[in-house]
């Protein structure tokens, strides 16, 4: 299940509204809402999301979660043509292996992607220069 389908369903359940009622409130077919919840349809348009937020009077946090989930649920995306060719090769490998990735592998990949942010947050350690001794003859 996509993040949007899950978030949409969880919000509807939290507000205690049946699909049929929500369809009437929003002016959509109940079958369309069902298709969204069971992930047969990709995330809906921003207009749909705004209407859902408005009709249920969602909080800012819920609205933010819904938009984040919609973005995460996009099934197609386009690579910027200016990217380094290694990115294209990496994405080809990712597409081929996505169905077989374990949760551990997915979490590791996400950690690696966040590594730059983590490194930026750590303070830079200053290295003290080594003091050299003056040239002296060794005692024997």
Predicted segments — roles?
Residues 47-65:
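DNA major-groove recognition helix of helix-turn-helix/homeodomain DNA-binding modules
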Residues 89, 94-140:
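C-terminal regulatory/oligomerization modules of transcriptional regulators
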Residues 20-23, 52:
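Short alpha-helical "recognition helix" segments of helix-turn-helix
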Residues 1-14, 108, 139:
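A short, Lys/Arg-rich alpha-helix, primarily the initiator
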Residues 64-97:
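Short, charged recognition helix plus adjacent turn
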Residues 8, 22-23, 33-36:
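Conserved hydrophobic/aromatic packing and binding residues within compact polymer-binding modules
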Residues 27-43, 51:
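Recognition helix of helix-turn-helix/homeodomain-like DNA-binding domains
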């Amino acid at each position: 299940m996509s993040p949007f389908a899950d978030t949409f369903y969880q919000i509807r359940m939290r507000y205690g509204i049946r699909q049929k009622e929500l369809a009437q409130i929003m002016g959509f077919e109940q079958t369309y809402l069902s298709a969204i919840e069971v992930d047969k349809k990709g995330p809906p348009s921003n207009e749909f999301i705004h209407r859902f937020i408005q009709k249920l009077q969602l909080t800012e946090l819920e609205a933010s979660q819904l938009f984040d989930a919609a973005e995460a649920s996009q099934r197609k995306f386009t690579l910027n043509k200016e990217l380094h060719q290694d990115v294209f090769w990496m994405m080809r490998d990712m597409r081929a292996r996505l169905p077989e990735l374990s949760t551990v592998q997915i979490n590791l990949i996400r950690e690696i992607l966040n590594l730059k942010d983590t490194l930026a947050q750590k303070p830079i350690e200053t290295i003290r220069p080594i003091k050299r001794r003056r040239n002296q003859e060794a005692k024997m």
